[in-house]
C-alpha cells in the first residue's frame, strides 16, 4: 500500500465554497505542506493541473530541493505539451530530484478550458492524441538509456529521429499514472499506463472498474496497478469526524453550488458525470443523502470538480475502509483533506499506525513504530517517557 498526499495549488481553506477561513496560495504555504508530507512519511504528493492551479512543473521544481524522499506526481498534458519536450522535462526533473518523479497523464474534460488552451478536439480525438503522446513519450525515454532514436507518424502527432541525450534515473522511464472512466480511457490505461487511478466511488463501482481495466490489460499481455483518489476527514471519534464534514460545507450557499454544478455539467468527462451523480447534481445536502456508501461522503463534490468524495470517520473505521479498497486491488491512495496542512498531520498521527506493517516500516524509514519523533511525544518531568493510555 502506497499513501500520497496533495499540494493545494488551487487554494486551501477550512471551509468549502467561501472565502471564510481561506489561505493564500503562496510558496511558503505550499512548502509547509510539502515538507510536512515528507517528514510525516507520505510517499509522494499529487500536484494538480489546470487553469485554476499554479503550474505543476514549476511548483514541483520549487519543492523538490526542500524535501528529501517525497515523490512528485506531475501532469503531462497532450495538446499543451509536445511529447519530445515532455520527455526532456521528465528526464531532467528525474535526474535533478534523484529519481523522485511520477507522471500523471491528463487528457482533460472541460471543453471550455481546453479551447482556451488551444485544444479543439472532441472526446474521442483527445484520447487518440493522448495514446499517441504517451507512446512517443515512453519510447523516447526508454531508448535514451542506450542512446537510441525513435520515429513515429500518427494521426495527431509525429516525430522523426527523436532522441534524448540525458536519460532519467528511473528505468525505463518515470512511472505513468492515469485516470478516466470512459471506454476510451480504460483502453488507454490497459495499453499504455502503469497505474490506473479512479476517483473515490463506492467499492462496488471501483471493483467493476478494476476488473474491466485488468481484463483489458490482460488481453494485451500487460498488468496494471490501481490507485484511488480520495479526500479524508478523520478525527478521534466518528461523531467528531462527521461534525467536521458538516462544518466543511456549512458556509456553502445554494447559488455557489448551482454555479459549480453548471460548470461541471458542461464537461464531457465521464468521471465528472459519475461524481455529479453521487450527489444528484448538488441537490442532496443532508448526511443521509451524501453518505453514498458506509463512511464515503460526497459533500466535497458539491463545489469541487474532480475528486468529490471523502472517507469520514474515526481512525479504525477509515483504515478499515482503505483496506476494503485494498482488497479490491487498490494499492495506491492519493489523499487530501481540508486544510491540507492540518489534515496531513491528523491522518498521519491517527491512521498511519493502523496501516499494514510493511507500510508502517516504509513510513518510519525502517522503524516499525511509525513516523513520530521518538515516537513517544514530549518527555514528562525531564525523565519519564510517556506510554500509550490503556483502554
Curated annotation (Swiss-Prot):
Pfam families reported in the protein's UniProt record: Bac_luciferase
GO biological process: alkanesulfonate catabolic process
Reaction equation(s) it catalyzes: an alkanesulfonate + FMNH2 + O2 = an aldehyde + FMN + sulfite + H2O + 2 H(+)
Keyword terms of this UniProt record: Flavoprotein, FMN, Monooxygenase, Oxidoreductase
EC number(s) reported in the record: 1.14.14.5
CDD domains, sorted: Alkanesulfonate_monoxygenase
One MF annotation (Gene Ontology) recorded for this entry: alkanesulfonate monooxygenase activity
Similarity comment text for this entry: Belongs to the SsuD family.
Function: Catalyzes the desulfonation of aliphatic sulfonates.
Protein name (Swiss-Prot/TrEMBL): Alkanesulfonate monooxygenase
Organism of provenance: Paracidovorax citrulli (strain AAC00-1) (Acidovorax citrulli)
Gene assigned in the entry: ssuD
Amino acid at each position: 500500500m502506497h499513501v500520497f498526499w496533495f499540494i493545494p495549488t488551487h487554494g486551501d481553506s477550512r471551509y468549502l465554497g467561501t472565502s471564510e477561513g481561506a489561505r493564500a496560495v503562496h510558496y511558503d504555504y505550499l512548502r509547509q505542506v510539502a515538507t510536512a508530507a515528507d517528514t510525516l512519511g507520505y510517499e509522494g504528493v499529487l500536484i494538480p493541473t489546470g487553469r485554476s492551479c499554479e503550474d505543476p512543473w514549476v511548483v514541483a521544481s520549487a519543492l523538490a530541493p526542500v524535501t528529501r524522499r517525497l515523490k512528485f506526481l506531475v501532469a503531462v498534458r497532450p495538446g499543451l505539451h509536445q511529447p519530445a519536450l515532455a520527455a526532456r522535462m521528465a528526464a531532467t526533473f528525474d535526474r535533478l530530484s534523484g529519481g523522485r518523479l511520477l507522471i500523471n497523464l491528463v487528457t482533460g474534460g472541460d471543453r471550455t478550458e481546453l479551447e482556451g488552451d488551444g485544444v479543439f478536439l472532441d472526446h474521442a480525438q483527445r484520447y487518440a492524441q493522448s495514446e499517441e503522446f504517451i507512446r512517443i513519450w515512453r519510447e523516447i525515454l526508454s531508448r535514451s538509456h542506450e542512446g537510441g532514436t525513435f520515429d513515429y507518424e500518427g494521426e495527431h502527432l509525429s516525430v522523426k529521429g527523436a532522441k534524448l541525450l540525458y536519460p532519467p534515473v528511473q528505468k525505463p522511464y518515470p512511472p505513468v499514472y492515469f485516470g478516466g472512466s470512459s471506454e476510451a480511457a480504460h483502453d488507454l490505461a490497459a495499453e499504455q499506463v502503469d497505474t490506473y487511478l479512479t476517483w473515490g466511488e463506492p467499492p462496488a463501482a471501483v471493483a467493476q472498474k478494476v476488473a474491466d481495466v485488468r481484463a483489458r490489460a490482460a488481453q494485451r499481455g500487460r498488468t496494471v496497478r490501481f490507485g484511488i483518489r480520495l479526500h479524508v476527514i478523520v478525527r478521534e471519534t466518528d461523531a467528531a469526524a462527521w461534525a467536521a464534514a458538516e462544518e466543511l460545507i456549512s458556509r456553502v450557499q445554494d447559488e455557489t453550488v448551482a454555479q459549480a454544478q453548471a460548470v461541471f455539467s458542461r464537461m464531457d468527462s465521464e468521471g465528472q458525470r459519475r461524481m455529479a451523480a453521487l450527489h444528484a447534481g448538488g441537490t442532496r445536502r443532508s448526511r443521509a443523502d451524501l453518505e453514498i456508501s458506509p463512511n464515503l461522503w460526497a459533500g466535497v463534490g458539491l463545489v469541487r470538480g474532480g475528486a468529490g468524495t471523502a472517507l469520514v470517520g474515526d481512525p479504525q473505521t477509515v483504515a478499515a475502509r482503505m483496506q476494503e479498497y485494498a482488497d479490491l486491488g487498490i494499492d495506491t491512495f492519493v489523499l487530501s483533506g481540508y486544510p491540507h496542512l492540518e489534515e496531513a498531520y491528523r491522518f498521519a498521527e491517527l491512521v498511519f499506525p493502523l496501516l499494514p506493517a510493511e507500510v508502517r516500516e516504509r513510513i518510519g524509514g525502517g522503524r516499525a513504530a511509525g513516523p513520530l519523533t521518538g515516537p513517544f511525544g514530549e518527555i514528562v518531568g525531564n525523565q519519564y517517557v510517556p506510554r500509550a493510555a490503556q483502554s
